[in-house]
Amino acid sequence: MMHQGQTMMYPSVAHPIPPQLGNVNLNMASQYPQQQQNKLVAPRKSSNIKITDPNTNKEVVLGRPSPNVAAQPQQVSGVATQPMVYYTNPQQTSYNQSGTYYSGTAGVVPTGSQGRFGYPATQAGQSIPFMNPSMSNTVPASHKDNIAGPAPSGQSQLIGKPQGGLHMEKPVPSVKISMPAGRSDASKFRVADHAVQHRQKDNEVISGAMVSNKPVSEKESKAPSIPEKHSKESKAPSAVEKHPTAVTQPLPIQAAKPETDAATANSPSFLTGADEKKESLPMTDSLKDNKKNATRNDTKNLPQQPQSASPAEELKGQTSVKLGDDVVGHMETKSFDSEKVDLTSKVSGLTSATSESSISPILGKSEADSTSVNAADVPAMVISSAKLSSASTGEPQAVESLGVAAVKSKEIEITHQISPESSDGKIMSDSTENESHDFTVDLAEQASLATSKPGNSDATSFVTDPQELPKECTTSVPEDHSLMNTSHNKDTQTLSASVDASDVSEVNSGTSSESTSQSTNDKDIRSSIQETGLAVSGITPGMLPVNHSVASEGQVKHADGAKDESSTEQSSAVPTGSVRPLSREKPTAELARTKSTAGRKKKRKEMLSKADAAGSSDLYNAYKGPQEQSESVATSDGADSSSTVDGTHVLPEESEREVMCEDDGKKKVEPDDWEDAADMSTPKLQSSDSGNQASAVQLPDSDMTEANGRKKYSRDFLLTFAHQYSSLPVGIRMDTVTSTLFKDLAGKSYVIDREPHPSSARGSDRPTSRGDRRGPAMDDDKWLKSGVPYSPNRDAHMDLTNGPAINYRGGPGGAHGVLRNPRGALLVGPQSNAPQVPRSGSDADRWQQKGLIPSPVTPMQVMHKAEKKYVVGKVSDEEQAKQRQLKAILNKLTPQNFDKLFEQVKEVNIDNVSTLTGVISQIFDKALMEPTFCEMYANFCSHLAGALPDFSEDNEKITFKRLLLNKCQEEFERGEREEAEADKTEEEGEIKQTKEEREEKRVKARRRMLGNIRLIGELYKKRMLTERIMHECIKKLLGNYQNPDEENIEALCKLMSTIGEMIDHPKAKEHMDAYFDRMRNLSTSQLISSRVRFLLRDSIDLRKNKWQQRRKVDGPKKIDEVHRDAAQERHAQSSRSRGPVVSSLPRRGAPSMDYGSRGSAAPLVSPGPQQRGRGFGNQDIRYEQERHQFDRTVPLPQRSVKDEAITLGPQGGLARGMSLRGQPPVSNSELPSVVDQRRILSGPNGYNSVPSTTREDTSSRIPDRFSGRIATAAQSASSSHRPASQEGRSGNKSYSEEELREKSIATIREYYSAKDEKEVALCIEELNAPSFYPSLVSLWVNDSFERKDMERELLAKLFVGLYNGGYNLLSKPQLIEGLSSVLASLEDALSDSPRAAEYLGRLLARFVVEKILVLQDVGKLIEEGGEEPGHLVQEGIAADVLGAVLEWIRTEKGDSFLKEAKTSSNLKLEDFRPQHLKRSKLDAFMLT
């Protein structure tokens, strides 16, 4: 029956239980605990445990029966704060933890107003009896987190649920250990809620032993009630609350006061069975602690603990004894003999004032006839650790404490209770009971227990030197209390308990006075142990007899404060007060941090070498059967110094013990897969922690035999003999492992977690700092081998999160260069040379774990080796090597490196016909596929013909030319043959081909034939072939006259264009005429395509033009030629920009060049006064008709030049009749175009050249073929002076209005480029049309609206110059008329140029400023302007124009000039402003 205040909640059977609830690290294991990824562990096998006497090595028979004791109700109190519920599966199986059962209780229901840790001194409580889970194993247990209330009388019980671990455990019973009450004022305990601090790791606990200060008499122990004195003291705040919210003291180790010491002599200390007056402290089977071994490497990043004070500070005024891994490494498990042990003589009271406490693990109701204990069913009991705090700082630390079960006359009540007050199971207490130092008995973690040193049989001897206790790991243990070796003999935890320095010597008083009545016989205890499932494994014999006192030793940990040290306190319950470790499991990182003094630190190499001697992995014992376990226990007989430690003798080197203890914490390796667990279920080696078991352990050959038949021993097992043997035994090969291991470890980075301030990246509960945790059957050769490649960019701590476990597990804060494989093998330095298959991801662990059972080492299969292996670039045939070399040269052949590569060809030994034929074939192949380079390849053949010698074969002279000719004939005939084959397949249909395939084949054949024809022609030009061969080729191509083949005709045209000039000579005139007559007939035939007909016509025209091609087909050029041509183009461009020079004019037939760009306004260099020519500048591109007319009137250069003058200008243009006295006319070689205008040199009129301009288009440029004659005329021109008379002007020539418009536009555009007013004046004079001048002004002004401001400024300047610049070409009436025309079309111009009114106003203002017009004239023009008079005023355009005029005048001349102009003009601005306009530019000028 569960008390209501506990607020327990029970989930349904099918409720999925998460592995961890919230931030609390305490929870119950689910029925099937959730496994971490790649962390699957098979259930452990059970094994029987024999309890033997260490002196006689005989089995101890515990035959005293344990009467049934009725369950006593327990009053529960707590704090009604935030409840924390821990779930467990109600179904008890082999995978979950057994539940805790409570009887009905009566107490005060907790309220929210109660204090979090309210423990009234007057409260009395009752112990919770143990209920056999085997009888009622269906009731789950849950606990609330924060419950406080009246504490039980004189006792504190700590009830909690172990955390549901990820690895599978057998169900274990609850253990209740009662402890006598002591004085309430013995020591003041501080209460600290460590849950609000950093979370403690759930598997690291430090236990402190709650020791009673007063001896207990046998009579009192049997009494049903506690004496009055003790009853009063029981009302004091108890050390540990029964409820999970109960807390205990942080164990500040203080020296007991004198009055406390005095009181301890009279304090009753007894262990009763079930009465309410006994002082009990529950003990738990902490699955959380048991999980330490399995989850040291689990990927759980937990917060770090705050660092506590140094050990020196903690040891001030106190004495602590460290017990655990430091001792376990040197302790040897012992077996009991079969003889019975009188437990009555070995009962001791809890007399130590500080660290002495009696643990009476009394078995509850069970079947008394059971005679064996299954070690796998119930893990070992471990005394839960208490969180030690620094005495200097006084910080309260959470303590996970378990009470001492009460014992009453042959009954053992075991209660499995733990308090989850803190997030990780650390329990805090505010009790002031000095004798209530609590400690935890872990039923799941004990593996290897050390026995007492033989010879120490003094039942009353205690540790008397309080100063020696902190230094030593262990104290002496009596012989008659041995430890049992179980499957977890290596994974035990250290015990830590505070010892009062002043009360250590008082332990020997009254320890065994009350022990007789409470002890049970051997047989009954054994049967009870089996029935209740109590794991005797890891339990000292002192825990089985009644009232065995414990001199708990605990070395103050937290030297660096990084973590809670997982040390538990052993209650050996011996009269001598000796202390035994119950567990050995301790992380290496924790052990390293306990070494705060420099004297304890040794060299790295020494520590590593000694750490390996601590023993083999616990996986051997984890999967042993009962028989194997018994054998292991039997063979662990005979303790020596390495395993049995006498408390009175300090080991020679404490660092050696620490290193060996450190190694123990790393032996445990959990398989990552269920397959691996199955593989590991068969043990390969049976090892022990004993250092001298070489002679005792006899392993069967099957366990040590490799697949190859040789015996193989694990490295850990062999290192157990390090203390006895200095050399290896004969027949064992360790040279490879030893040299590899110690060489790498000594000289390279090796991760040892010894830093005093660990990094925050430390997240694993058991740091993987050492590489010793390997599978039991791990092959030594493969220890350092890893199939997982190391990635330098990979985070070594990436698998320390809650995500999937990756193979890389770096040491916490250690060197990142050291990684470890899934089995813990250390990856140091270069990895194995053996071929590895790199794997990553979730399958990596599974693949790597397959090697737990070593596989036979087989040599790698040798690949087949060819007799003649292939070597890249190596050619066995010499001829083939030559051909490859020649092909490489041809591939790099260019006109630029022609000479150099030809020298390389000559270096190739071409000494036979075969090589020469191959060279010719390669040249033809390159030429046919690259027709552009046929000329170069022909040149190459010409050079080869002269360089290569003649060869003789079969008395026949063979030359390069002969072979070349044969190749040409072969290729020529090949083309015909391919065409015939194509026709044949098409006609007969022997090979069915699609149309696309036939077309592709024809194209390929035609391309090859054309290349061949062109190469033949180029070879003929190099005189490599004869003329007769060329005629034969032509006849062949023209042979089929009636049904011509287009490919042949195309090849003929190509051949004619190549060799026509050479073959067309007088001797071959008849043949050539016949050829071209036939070609002329074919050009008009409709049987061939138009493309081929035009090819024929081009060939005919080419012969008429004396084989002068219209455009030169440029072939490959040298780099120098390319640079030279580019320089010539640049030079020609610059010459055209300045004006043509005689030497730079292109000759007839030269390619035309365009240098103009649209919109270019770059000024051209104005020619000198003696370089001005006459003409009208540029011709607009828009007037194509005039250009065509000009082309028709220009005679061709080859025509005979008659005596009459030749007009080079357009017909009817101004150039006609402009020659002086019948001399050759002056003309423009090229009419000005919009883009590229050239002012060509004039004739005998005295002007050498005219400037050229760049215009907007190139299409209207006159062909360059006219420049030749102009250059001739320019050479005879005189450059003396400008003639004085104007007789040269032709008054008879007149132009149409359209022509005048064109010329005027061309002139102004030329002016914008050249900026030469005189040239414009000359052009206007040439026009000789004064009536056209108003139109010219209108055209120029309208054109300026789309120009830039600079060009508009040039136009205004030009008008001023033409009006009063000495030219007198424009008059005022002409100017006003032109401006009126502009105003008439201004409204339309505004649609194209919105700022046209402003531009016009600026021009008019310029006329006013230059005094060409007065402001009154301007006003009149604006007022009367428009399509109709006054229209601009109505539209508001007049106001904009006049406002722009006035604005510009004021800007340029100032207000005074503007005012004077306004005054003189009598202009009324109001007349120009329409009434409907709200705002106008005139508004600013109307006010002044």
UniProtKB/Swiss-Prot annotation:
Q: Which GO terms describe its cellular component?
A: eukaryotic translation initiation factor 4F complex
Tell me the domain of life.
Answer: Eukaryota
Question: What are the UniProt keywords, alphabetically?
Answer: Initiation factor, Protein biosynthesis, Translation regulation
In this chain the MIF4G domain maps to: 883-1106
Q: Where is the composition biased (Low complexity)?
A: 496-520
Q: Name one GO biological process term.
A: regulation of translation
Q: Which GO terms describe its molecular function?
A: mRNA binding; translation initiation factor activity
What residue stretches are annotated with the MI domain? 1299-1423
Region annotated EIF4E-binding sits at 709-721
Q: Positions of the region Disordered?
A: 196-320, 337-367, 415-707, 753-795, 974-1000, 1107-1299
Q: Which PROSITE patterns match?
A: MI
**Ranges annotated as biased composition (Acidic residues):** 978-989
- Residues in coiled coil: none
Stretches of Basic and acidic residues bias are at 216-244, 274-299, 555-566, 651-671, 753-784, 990-1000, 1111-1132, 1181-1191, 1254-1267
| Record-annotated membrane-spanning stretches | none
Tell me the subunit arrangement: EIF4F is a multi-subunit complex, the composition of which varies with external and internal environmental conditions. It is composed of at least EIF4A, EIF4E and EIF4G. In higher plants two isoforms of EIF4F have been identified, named isoform EIF4F and isoform EIF(iso)4F. Isoform EIF4F has subunits p220 and p26, whereas isoform EIF(iso)4F has subunits p82 and p28.
Q: Write out the similarity annotation.
A: Belongs to the eukaryotic initiation factor 4G family.
Its function, per the record, reads: Component of the protein complex eIF4F, which is involved in the recognition of the mRNA cap, ATP-dependent unwinding of 5'-terminal secondary structure and recruitment of mRNA to the ribosome.
What is this protein's name? Eukaryotic translation initiation factor 4G
Q: Which organism is it from?
A: Triticum aestivum (Wheat)
